[in-house]
Amino acid sequence: MSDDKDAVDAITAQWFAVRPDLDTAPMAVFGRIYRIAKAMGDATEQCYGRFGISRGEFDVVATLRRSGDPYTLSPRQLSATLMLTTGGMTGRLDKLEKAGLLVRKPDPHDRRGLQVTITDRGLALIDEAVTAGLEVQRAALTGLTDEEIAVLTGLLRRLLAGI
């Protein structure tokens, strides 16, 4: 494990210098989480951009792919899964449908509803994009052992559950 100081250490040291009464441990944890999220967000955005889609668009197609054959969900199900408003979802669906990655069809069980399904082109693209995205994520973890990754995963799961 490296003892190198980083920018977050500098920030917490500055706070300690002016406010030694503060416990900056939460700042040290969340400052790093924010920086990791930003760096990984930028890296995955660039990765998915090579496939002509944004991270948000990737999330839509990936959610359909994960749903299993026939890779179909309603716009409402997609919105709920991705925590998006229906308006935000409509814009993504419009772009993805125009690109030929998905189709919207009337729901045969609900005359007022729609179903969203991945096209063959979308299926091929998402399978390549998810593999490429995992390679980006795997590369970011190269400094950790498998055991450290497992411990970190468990700690982050507990942290998330407590929020």
State where each predicted segment sits.
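Short, charged, intrinsically disordered terminal tails
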Residues: 161-163
